[in-house]
């Protein structure tokens, strides 16, 4: 399966328009034409997560929290985000994040939490542009 097919499946379940205005969900780094050799799921992208993906031979990391929230004028390795960006690119690892779009999706994170604590008649009251 190509990485772009994984991305399409994720976005069918949790469409990007469901993300809050502050968010940066979606494709973070990489090209999606390659065949997926494996996917590592995580809450946050860290160097340890990328090291594990490299050790396993996986070329896709799917995180809940986006690695990149702000624009960068240069990538020089001055912080952990830049280190992760450089490591992912150097090792041909695609990073995809499903954050508030997954939280807000019907059947997504918030709905699963409601289900686990026994709530019924759950619906999304509003979407936020905050």
Question: Where do the language-model regions lie?
Answer:
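Conserved small/polar residues in nucleotide/adenosyl-binding loops
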Residues: 126-130
């Amino acid at each position: 399966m190509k990485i772009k097919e994984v991305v399409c499946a994720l976005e069918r379940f949790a469409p990007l328009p469901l993300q809050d205005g502050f968010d940066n969900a979606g494709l973070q780094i990489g090209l999606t034409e390659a065949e997926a050799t494996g996917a590592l799921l995580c809450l946050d992208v860290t160097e340890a997560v990328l090291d594990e993906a490299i050790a396993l031979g996986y070329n896709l990391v799917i995180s809940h929290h986006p690695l990149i929230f702000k624009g960068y004028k240069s990538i020089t390795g001055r912080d952990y985000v830049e280190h992760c960006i450089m490591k992912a690119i150097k090792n041909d690892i695609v990073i995809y994040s499903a954050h508030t779009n997954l939280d807000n999706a019907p059947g997504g994170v918030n709905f699963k939490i409601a289900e686990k604590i026994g709530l019924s008649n759950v619906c999304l009251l509003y979407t936020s542009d905050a």
